[in-house]
Amino acid sequence: MKTNAGRFFEDYRLGETIAHAVPRTVSGGERALYHALYPARHALSSSDEFARACGLPAAPVDELMAFHLVFGKTVPDISLNAVANLGYAEGRWLKPVFPGDTLRAESTVIGLKENSNGASGVVWVRTRGLNQQGEAVLSYVRWVMVRKRDTAAPAPAPTVPELAGSVAASDLVIPEGLSFTDYDLTLAGEPHRWGDYAVGEKIDHVDGVTVEESEHMLATRLWQNTAKVHFDATNRPDGRRLIYGGHVISLARTLSFNGLANAQMIVALNAGAHANPCFAGDTVRAWSEVLDKAETADPGVGALRLRLVAMKHGTEPFVTRSEDGKYLPGVLLDLDYWALVPR
């Protein structure tokens, strides 16, 4: 048999490392298409000249674009037969990615636990994205609910990894050369620096985007993400194509420009949950909350820990859960990340 039906829960072994196929050379074409698919306007990843003024050799690609490219490499081996992508932790961007870089990915299985229904289980993996020099550019943990091929297959001994609640500010990687000494607030689009944000502050990002069927499938193909639920309408009982969760992340992040234009680089992903599914026709809006602030090794660069929530139009902002503790039906995404901001 020459075709690949993908892995099922019983195919994973604790401690195994999976080298994912098909390296990807990044070009300016991907960046142009990213900016066409999402309302991306952050200056550092838009302008070579702005990036050079900030000490970088050129404009890096958007950090989430690098994430999607690495994530897409993992799908055929990790989540082709997934029921749902459940969460993220311990994500760190370690080096900027520039056009011309070639990315590949590898994942190590760090946890396995069969569900009580015996029909699926949860797989935890730590994924690394590597460039052409073999340098890690990105590392993160995610956990996925995966179907079993044979419900009678014996369950592995349950192993649930202990994961950090957040990435410590001292572990944030400031890209080599990055300096905001000559940062141009006018060109960046907003006057707000690190000191202008207060812990507990909440920001409604005002704008919204209605998701189109063709756009979300085009974006998911751009990342070479082959998960069946995003393309095949016969793969779900409701006959609908599920929007790739990363598509919602990028929509929310780019909408956050309105209020967080100077949050120029994402450097860590503390946690994340796809609270409810998103489908074509949904209009996505976003709000943020400042969870923490930290100084960095560079006196001109500060870090903001931000909570980014994506919600469907009509959902009340700044509220995520009902009285029973469950996410409200209109909440799509609840993401916790660190970003670099000029001081």
Curated annotation (Swiss-Prot):
Keywords: Lyase. Substrate binds at residues 60-63, 83-86, 94-96. Residues 47-116 form the MaoC-like domain. Its EC number is 4.2.1.148. GO terms for biological process: acetate catabolic process. Induction: Strongly up-regulated during growth on acetate as sole carbon source. It catalyses: (2R,3S)-beta-methylmalyl-CoA = 2-methylfumaryl-CoA + H2O. GO terms for molecular function: oxo-acid-lyase activity. Disruption phenotype: Cells lacking this gene are not able to grow on acetate as a sole carbon source. It comes from the Bacteria. CDD domains: FkbR2. Optimum pH is 7.5. Involved in the ethylmalonyl-CoA pathway for acetate assimilation. Catalyzes the reversible hydration of mesaconyl-CoA (2-methylfumaryl-CoA) to yield beta-methylmalyl-CoA ((2R,3S)-beta-methylmalyl-CoA). PANTHER family: BETA-METHYLMALYL-COA DEHYDRATASE, MONOAMINE OXIDASE-RELATED. This is Mesaconyl-CoA hydratase. The gene is mch.
